[in-house]
C-alpha cells in the first residue's frame, strides 16, 4: 500500500490541491490527513461549516472521481461540535473514511485514529485531555472556551475544571478499537508522543504525550502518524523516529499562506517512507 500523509492543512486550499495533484502524478490511491483540516482564521463557527459544505465537499467529490481514497481525523482546531457535519459529509462518499476513535481495514493495513490532544496554552480547549502528572501550562488567553467552544470561563476556573471534568489520555487510549493482528496497524494520532523529537515547540519545550509514548512502546504496531506541532521538525531536525517496533512520523507543516507544503510518501510493502516539500 502506498499513501501520502500530511497534517495541519488548516483549510489551505492550495495545499489540498497540491496533495491531490501529487497523488495523481505518482499514481497513489490514498491520502491520509492527520488532523486540523479546517480554517482557523476568523470566526470559526461561521467559516468552518462553510468550508465543510463548500470546498471540502467538492474536494472529496474530486478525489472520488479520480479513484483516490482519503483517510482522515479532525484536529484540535477543528470545532468538535462540527463532527456531525463532517461525518455526514464523509458518509456521502465511499472513498472517505473518518477514523477518529474508529478502525478501518484497507488492504493489509488497519488504520486507527484519535483527534484528541493534551491540554495546551491556547484558550480554545477543543478536544483537550489531561494525563498523569500533566501540569497546566501558562495560558496565552485570559478567556478559556469549553463545552465545544460555547462556554467561557477564567484561567482560574479552568485550572479547577480540568482536575475533574476532563478525560485522561490513558483512558481514551485504552478504549480505542483493537488492532487486527493479521494486518499492519497504523495509528493516526494528532498529538505526537513525548520524547522522540516529534513534539518540540519553538521554545524547545517538549509537549508530546507520555501516555501515547507508552501506548506505542507497548503496541508493537507498525507505524504511527502525528502532527499538531507545526515547527517540530524544524526545531529538532527529526521527522521520524521509533518507539519499540513502531515507526513514528511527524512531517511538520508550514503556516497558512506560506509557500511550502510538507508531506510524506509511505510504502507499507517496501517498508519505506520519504519526506518531501512542494
What are these regions (language model features)?
Residues 109-202:
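Active-site-proximal loop/helix segment associated with metal-binding centers of metalloenzymes
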Residues 7, 38-51, 121, 125-131:
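Acidic/histidine-rich helix-loop elements
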Residues 13-106, 251:
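Core catalytic region of metal-dependent phosphoesterases/phosphodiesterases
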Residues 104-107, 210-218, 232-278:
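Binuclear metal-dependent phosphoesterase catalytic core
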Residues 28-32, 212, 216, 220-226:
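Proline-aspartate-enriched helix->loop->beta-strand connector
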Residues 38, 42-53, 179-220:
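Active-site-proximal segments of metal-dependent phosphoesterases and phosphodiesterases across multiple
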Residues 10-14, 38-42, 72-84, 103-105, ...:
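Active-site environment of divalent metal-dependent phosphoester hydrolases
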Amino acid at each position: 500500500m502506498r499513501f501520502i500523509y500530511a497534517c495541519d492543512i488548516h483549510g489551505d486550499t492550495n495545499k489540498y490541491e497540491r496533495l491531490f495533484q501529487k497523488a495523481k502524478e505518482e499514481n497513489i490511491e490514498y491520502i491520509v490527513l492527520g488532523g486540523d483540516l479546517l480554517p482557523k482564521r476568523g470566526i470559526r463557527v461561521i467559516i468552518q461549516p462553510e468550508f465543510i459544505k463548500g470546498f471540502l465537499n467538492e474536494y472529496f467529490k474530486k478525489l472520488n472521481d479520480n479513484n483516490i481514497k482519503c483517510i482522515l481525523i479532525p484536529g484540535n482546531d477543528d470545532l468538535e461540535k462540527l463532527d456531525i457535519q463532517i461525518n455526514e459529509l464523509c458518509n456521502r462518499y465511499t472513498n472517505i473514511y473518518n477514523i477518529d476513535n474508529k478502525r478501518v481495514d484497507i488492504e493489509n493495513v488497519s488504520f486507527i485514529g484519535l483527534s484528541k490532544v493534551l491540554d495546551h496554552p491556547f484558550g480554545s480547549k477543543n478536544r483537550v485531555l489531561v494525563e498523569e502528572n500533566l501540569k497546566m501550562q501558562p495560558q496565552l488567553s485570559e478567556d478559556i472556551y469549553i463545552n465545544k467552544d460555547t462556554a467561557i470561563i477564567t484561567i482560574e476556573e479552568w485550572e479547577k475544571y480540568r482536575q475533574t471534568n476532563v478525560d485522561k489520555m490513558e483512558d481514551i487510549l485504552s478504549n480505542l478499537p483493537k488492532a487486527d493482528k493479521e494486518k499492519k496497524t497504523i495509528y493516526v494520532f494528532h498529538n505526537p508522543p513525548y520524547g522522540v523529537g516529534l513534539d518540540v515547540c519553538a521554545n524547545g519545550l517538549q509537549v508530546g504525550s507520555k501516555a501515547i509514548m507508552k501506548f506505542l512502546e507497548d503496541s508493537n504496531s507498525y507505524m504511527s502518524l502525528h502532527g499538531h506541532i507545526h515547527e517540530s521538525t524544524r526545531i529538532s531536525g527529526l521527522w521520524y523516529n521509533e518507539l519499540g517496533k513502531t515507526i513514528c512520523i511527524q512531517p511538520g507543516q508550514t503556516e497558512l499562506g506560506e509557500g511550502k507544503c510538507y508531506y510524506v510518501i509511505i510504502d507499507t510493502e517496501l517498508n519505506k517512507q520519504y519526506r518531501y516539500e512542494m
